[in-house]
């Protein structure tokens, strides 16, 4: 089967191949051509959960996060734990069940289990870990999770069910590096239960012994924290001895973030800082904090250089100016941009995603005006009526008709039609008289009408 060959997972494969690719296709169809002697050409048309551009953004963001985690040279356990902690602390579950891709996870920070497991796969692969995506059932729900290899044994990981996206929640390890016995509520699909699969991926008979971090040592309520400039957050200790308490909090770089004697951190400027807590019994715990600017507080202006955008059936992707306070931001450095379909009259949408020293999302809208009415003509004449017609436009709300009684006269609104009607009969006219008409399309947008340009003047005379 060509498709299964294309998505076959290899331990030395790239992070965008194998299970990652398989978890991101949504549909496909196959066509074949046997017109040539002894040769058949198969053409696969694939539909994916994300676009090529979105996958480029995923690669960029994953590298940025992994660089900040700085575990490339660490042992397998430390790498797996760093990925687990980042994903479970920063990504929320999508209870609307609409977001499924790694893009939704790493960029939108909201996704269902498929996005959790595929992002886990990509990040672990980039760190050189052996990892697979597993599907099956969690209780009665269809579900996706991972297995990863530490030394010579494989362990179960479910970052979806360990996710604790709340300000004061600490990291959960209930589903991290577990054996099958402690993962009994996860029932694998049959292809992951065969003897050949089990032979290729031998599961450890015991869960990883140091997996529950907070049961082993004193720690802070966050092991890593992502903040925006101006944000405030409170640290506190986990697993303190009864006769011990935190004596001091210190920041490795107060220019990036300061911390009070009570553990309250204030984000000052972009950068990375380590917060260290020391107890009276000289126990230490740290949290790595990454501070960025909040892109949602930026301003989008000069869309299309303030030139009116007119419908032409093509997707509109106008230029823009993005500023944060007095600084002009650069696409590809400070933000990436995606556009809505923007093919019809009405409201166009732009979405910016923070990059580099910026994080968050900024949305902007612009107006797409109907195009100029064309194809205007007179289709019927009587002594007291004139019937006009014109070419329909896609996506408009209707058409307005204007009339003048001389070539230099003032045009007056005389009537309108809906978007479904491209004819209009002007009645009660004077016999053997010449009239002049203009037509324009309009689009209702909230409480506003967006008008297209007037058609050419249509001159007509009654009988």
Language model segments and positions:
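Secondary-structure boundary elements
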Residues: 50-105
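Hydrophobic/aromatic-rich core segments of domains that either
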Residues: 115-183
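His-Asp-centered catalytic microenvironments across diverse enzyme cores
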Residues: 153-219
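Extracytoplasmic soluble-region selector
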Residues: 215-297, 308-310, 314-347, 353-366
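Pro/Thr/Ser/Gly-rich low-complexity, intrinsically disordered linker/stalk tracts
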Residues: 369-395, 431, 447-463
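Recognizes extended acidic, P/S/T-rich segments that occur
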Residues: 400-431
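Beta-strand-rich modules
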Residues: 426-447
């Amino acid at each position: 089967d060509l498709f299964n060959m294309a998505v076959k997972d290899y331990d030395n494969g790239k992070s965008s191949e194998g299970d990652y690719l398989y978890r991101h296709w949504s549909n496909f169809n196959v066509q074949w051509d046997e017109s040539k002697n002894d040769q058949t050409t198969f053409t696969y048309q694939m539909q994916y959960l994300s676009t090529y551009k979105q996958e480029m953004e995923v690669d960029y963001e994953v590298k940025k996060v992994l660089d900040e985690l700085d575990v490339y040279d660490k042992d397998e356990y430390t790498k797996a734990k760093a990925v687990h902690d980042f994903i479970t602390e920063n990504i929320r579950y999508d209870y609307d069940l609409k977001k499924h891709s790694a893009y939704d996870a790493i960029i939108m920070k909201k996704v269902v289990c498929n996005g959790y497991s595929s992002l886990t796969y990509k990040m672990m692969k980039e760190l050189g870990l052996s990892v697979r995506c597993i599907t099956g059932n969690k209780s009665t729900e269809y579900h996706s999770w991972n297995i990863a290899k530490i030394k010579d044994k494989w362990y179960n990981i479910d970052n979806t069910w360990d996710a604790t996206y709340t300000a004061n929640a600490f990291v959960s390890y209930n589903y991290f590096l577990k054996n099958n016995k402690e993962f009994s509520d996860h029932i694998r699909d049959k292809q992951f239960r065969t003897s050949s699969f089990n032979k290729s991926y031998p599961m450890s008979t015991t869960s990883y012994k140091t997996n529950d971090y907070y049961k082993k040592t004193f720690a802070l309520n966050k092991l890593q924290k992502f903040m925006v400039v101006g944000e405030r957050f409170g640290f506190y200790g986990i697993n303190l001895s009864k006769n011990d308490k935190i004596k001091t909090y210190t920041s490795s770089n107060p220019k990036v973030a300061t911390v009070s004697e009570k553990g309250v951190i204030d984000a000052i400027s972009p950068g990375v800082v380590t917060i260290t807590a020391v107890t009276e019994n000289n126990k230490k715990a740290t949290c790595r904090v990454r501070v960025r600017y909040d892109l949602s507080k930026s301003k989008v202006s000069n869309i299309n250089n303030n030139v009116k955008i007119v419908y032409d059936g093509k997707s509109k992707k106008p230029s823009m100016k993005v500023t944060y306070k007095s600084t002009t931001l650069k696409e590809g450095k400070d933000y990436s941009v995606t556009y809505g379909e923007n093919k019809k009259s009405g409201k166009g949408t732009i979405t910016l995603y923070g990059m580099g020293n910026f994080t968050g999302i900024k949305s902007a809208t612009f107006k797409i005006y109907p195009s100029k009415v064309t194809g205007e003509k007179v289709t019927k004449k009587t002594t007291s009526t004139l019937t006009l017609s014109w070419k329909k436009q896609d996506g408009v709300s209707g058409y307005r008709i204007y009339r003048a009684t001389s070539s230099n006269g003032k045009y007056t609104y005389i009537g309108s039609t809906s978007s479904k009607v491209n004819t209009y009969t002007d009645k009660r006219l004077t016999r053997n008289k010449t009239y002049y008409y203009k037509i324009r399309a309009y689009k209702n947008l909230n409480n506003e009408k967006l008008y297209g340009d007037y058609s050419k003047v249509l001159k007509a005379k009654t009988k």
